Design a protein with these regions (language model features):
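Post-signal peptide N-terminal segment of mature Sec-exported envelope proteins
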Residues: 29-51
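Bacterial Sec signal peptide processing site at the extreme N-terminus
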Residues: 16-35
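Sec-dependent bacterial lipoprotein signal peptides
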Residues: 1-19
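Surface-exposed short loop/turn segments
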Residues: 25, 53-65, 71-72, 76, ...
Length: 136
């Protein structure tokens, strides 16, 4: 019986951790994300996707945390590739819904934002060109 409590407690903690925004790595804080094209002189690296949330924990995560986490995930992935500039191509919020009926045969339901996905093109730019100090 004691192991059931441990399992339940562990599951609860894991679920709550899923409600927090993905943390941005210290170096990734310097990655600039903009809808503007990369300046001339920047080198294209790859496309990156940042995501936060899913159908299970997304409904328990605030929209602000979903948005912040997806942006942090994008920055972390771009930084891991050596990029310091991301041209944001798309930003989408995923909605999960349900349909239900009522006692009078009416149709009802609900929907909630459960994830956010950002897609962008990652570039490495001369730091001075994008407003970063040369040591960045």
């Amino acid at each position: 019986m004691h192991s059931y409590y441990k399992f339940g407690y562990s599951f609860l903690l894991a679920s709550l951790v899923g409600c927090a925004a993905i943390v941005v790595n210290p170096q990734a804080r310097k990655v600039i994300v903009s809808p503007n094209h990369a300046p001339k002189g920047c080198l294209y690296i790859d496309q990156v996707v940042g995501n936060q949330g899913n159908f299970f924990v997304g409904g328990y995560t605030s929209n602000a945390h979903l948005e912040e986490g997806a942006m942090n995930d994008l920055r972390n992935k771009a930084n891991a590739l050596g990029a310091n500039y991301v041209q944001l191509i798309s930003n989408r919020a995923g909605i999960t819904g349900s349909m239900g009926g009522s006692y009078d045969n009416g149709v009802g339901g609900s929907s909630t934002q459960t994830n956010v996905t950002n897609v962008g093109n990652a570039y490495h730019c001369p730091p001075k060109l994008i407003g970063l100090s040369p040591s960045a």
